[in-house]
Amino acid sequence: ATHAVQSTYGYEYQGDNLLLARVNLLLTYAEHLQARWQRKPTKEELQPIATIISWNLWQMDGLRLSVPGGKPQPETEQLDLFSMFGAAEPQPPTVSCKVKNWRKGSHGTAQNFETIQEGSTSMKFDYVIGNPPYQISDGGASVSATPIYNRFIEAIKTTHPGAICLIIPAKWYSGGKGLDKFREEMLGDRHISTLVDYSNSLDVFPNVDVAGGVCYFVWKEAYNGKCKYTNYRNGKATTVYRDLNEFQTFIRYPVASEIVKKVKEDGEL
């Protein structure tokens, strides 16, 4: 379990989100110990794990690869003739972020995060899990908004992670502005081992109504085969193993797809 924590890295800009991530990772370690040995961890066991987590989950501006140096904007003040052309406030110096390689030395060896980005050390994402932004509004009705979750998925795949698990709108099955190529690639991707579909988004997000429902998928680099597809509709789950692109148009409901398949086999379609 300690090695698993040592191998888990991540950064976050917002301090409150960082705190939540650290707490959740520490709780995961404690829950594992409870499940494995049927006891709670001691303070002596938690202290080194907390130290590892404080190093491995850090606060960083991902665009600058540095410690966030911003501060809240001051309240608007009335300008006067003598202050409006004053000297610009100097920017704080950039502070590099450091991470530790816990496999080197008894207490790990620290190195600048930039050196990892520059390729001096190979960096690979084992798992990518999340809920990416869904769309960008173009000022019109929501139906005309431009999806952007597809861009996140395409970018993530270029990093060749071991596995991806993302929850996104299900509208891409048959619609969505500018999603034709994305739809074709997703339906033909045999690395998608699992696709779980919720016809009603309220089953997942009680306070958010996403038109067309939502879905989450599991993409595995080492997998190549049929997809385990589950559809939730009116509280009932139906699961089948299928090729997502078996029909020219994706059929969402397994019962309907079986009917179409049967009709095609009988030569009546």
Tell where the protein language model's regions lie, with residue ranges.
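SAM-dependent methyltransferase catalytic region
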Residues: 1-195, 200-204, 209-216, 220-234
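Flexible, glycine-/basic-rich loop-and-beta segments that form/coincide
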Residues: 207-269
